[in-house]
Amino acid sequence: MSRSVKKGAYVHVRLLKKIERLNQKGEKQIIKTWARSSTIVPAMVGHTLAVYNGKTHIPVFITDALVGHKLGEFAPTRNFRSHVKGDRKIRKSI
């Protein structure tokens, strides 16, 4: 179920304050954040946010196309390594 329209999008309070402060100054710098559940709002467009994936901060440049998505969508937490190709041959020999 999606979030109620009357509540508005969830954005971490400190993250929003940092972005508003940078917008007032007209500065662009990388902002580190652990708030993966925050929704991307139009005020964030043009900024680079370093989103934590559990190991490192992954830089995400915010564009108009990303508005409405969550920050965590762009910082994958799991690293898939392909399945072993010769696994059947190894099992037959045992």
Curated annotation (Swiss-Prot):
<keyword id="KW-0150">Chloroplast</keyword>
<keyword id="KW-0694">RNA-binding</keyword>
<keyword id="KW-0699">rRNA-binding</keyword>
<keyword id="KW-0689">Ribosomal protein</keyword>
<comment type="similarity">
    <text>Belongs to the universal ribosomal protein uS19 family.</text>
</comment>
<dbReference type="GO" id="GO:0019843">
    <property type="term" value="F:rRNA binding"/>
</dbReference>
<dbReference type="Pfam" id="PF00203">
    <property type="entry name" value="Ribosomal_S19"/>
</dbReference>
<dbReference type="GO" id="GO:0005763">
    <property type="term" value="C:mitochondrial small ribosomal subunit"/>
</dbReference>
<keyword id="KW-0687">Ribonucleoprotein</keyword>
<comment type="function">
    <text>Protein S19 forms a complex with S13 that binds strongly to the 16S ribosomal RNA.</text>
</comment>
<dbReference type="InterPro" id="IPR002222">
    <property type="entry name" value="Ribosomal_uS19"/>
</dbReference>
<dbReference type="GO" id="GO:0009507">
    <property type="term" value="C:chloroplast"/>
</dbReference>
<dbReference type="InterPro" id="IPR023575">
    <property type="entry name" value="Ribosomal_uS19_SF"/>
</dbReference>
<dbReference type="GO" id="GO:0006412">
    <property type="term" value="P:translation"/>
</dbReference>
<dbReference type="GO" id="GO:0000028">
    <property type="term" value="P:ribosomal small subunit assembly"/>
</dbReference>
<protein>
    <recommendedName>
        <fullName>Small ribosomal subunit protein uS19c</fullName>
    </recommendedName>
</protein>
<dbReference type="GO" id="GO:0003735">
    <property type="term" value="F:structural constituent of ribosome"/>
</dbReference>
<dbReference type="InterPro" id="IPR020934">
    <property type="entry name" value="Ribosomal_uS19_CS"/>
</dbReference>
<keyword id="KW-0934">Plastid</keyword>
<dbReference type="InterPro" id="IPR005732">
    <property type="entry name" value="Ribosomal_uS19_bac-type"/>
</dbReference>
